[in-house]
Amino acid sequence: MAKGKFERTKPHVNIGTIGHVDHGKTSLTAAITKYFGEFKAYDQIDAAPEEKARGITISTAHVEYETENRHYAHVDCPGHADYVKNMITGAAQMDGAILVVSAADGPMPQTREHILLARQVGVPAIVVFLNKVDQVDDPELLELVELEIRELLSKYEFPGDDIPIVKGSALAALEDSNKEIGEDAVRQLMAEVDKYIPTPERPIDQPFLMPIEDVFSISGRGTVVTGRVERGVVKVGEEVEIVGIRPTSKTTVTGVEMFRKLLDQGQAGDNIGALLRGIDREGVERGQVLAKPGSVTPHTKFKAEAYILTKEEGGRHTPFFTNYRPQFYFRTTDVTGVVTLPEGTEMVMPGDNVTMDVTLIVPIAMEERLRFAIREGGRTVGAGIVASITE
């Protein structure tokens, strides 16, 4: 496959391999690059560089490849803890995942945990690669494993009966030892991924939202709020809401500027200043958001999925219990919240990932899948995601 320059003409999709340790995630990643990208050997992918996301160090390998229909950015993590951290911090956003399961072992504890995490962090779709099928001679056993995987997916509210399961061997693909379960299976897998994993909506097509980072008053002109537009478009003359911390208020954007130049609109990715009509300097603050009216609402209570840093990662040295009161850093500001642990969980140790209920002392513009950091006095001790809103 000739490598031309990166063509922006194809839709872009972020994807990743998930599944139990040693079931073949990295070998499969290498095999996909062999047929659809610039070949990366197992060792190149496995020696993933460390990166920091929200103050947390994560090892992640990034590869890219393309099918006829799409361009893919693919993440693969060497260790289980890296997956947990990656999915919770959203360091590697996943529009879909390839779940790798060894046919010889069937679903294992991390298989289950990664499916649960995918559900909690809102990975929209999963395609399954049943790996190492050459190690299983009995077709009935293969069927049984497939059934087990489908049941497990359904249990975590994925459409287990409809999810494509492709059977093959990543090793056979890498070694060219058996075309049918090697190359053919990898090509079939990517055809299923192309078909089954939906193309994500581009940020610019979503309703406007901008977290407010700073507030200025400009004499004779009014109040300007600055920030980076997270999604959507805002045009001069449009009505917006200011949401979070205080009661929601409405205003009109009377000007948009970027790099000191006046624009008629600001869009996803732009760092802008928005001039607001009839709002004084005291009427708005960092931590609120500017949003399309009715698109986002303020909440104080939610269920979270969180990863708590180990001591070595710079986190807490001791466990915490129900009624723990750290700060939750959403977008641009810290808000104190009270933690309630689920029944049967007495305490949370550094290094755990946990589902917990949180009640904030002031409301924040919130939606499912919003990420946050957990902090104590400005120091990050955990990362989390809003799994569901309770109130």
Swiss-Prot record:
Residues 19-26 are annotated as: G1. Mg(2+) binds at T26. Belongs to the TRAFAC class translation factor GTPase superfamily. Classic translation factor GTPase family. EF-Tu/EF-1A subfamily. It is found in: Cytoplasm. This is Elongation factor Tu. The keyword Hydrolase applies. It comes from the Bacteria. Keywords: Cytoplasm, Elongation factor, GTP-binding, Hydrolase, Magnesium, Metal-binding, Nucleotide-binding, Protein biosynthesis. Residues 55-59 are annotated as: G2. It catalyses: GTP + H2O = GDP + phosphate + H(+). One of its GO terms (cellular component) is cytosol. It is an enzyme of class 3 (hydrolase). Pfam families: GTP_EFTU, GTP_EFTU_D2, GTP_EFTU_D3.
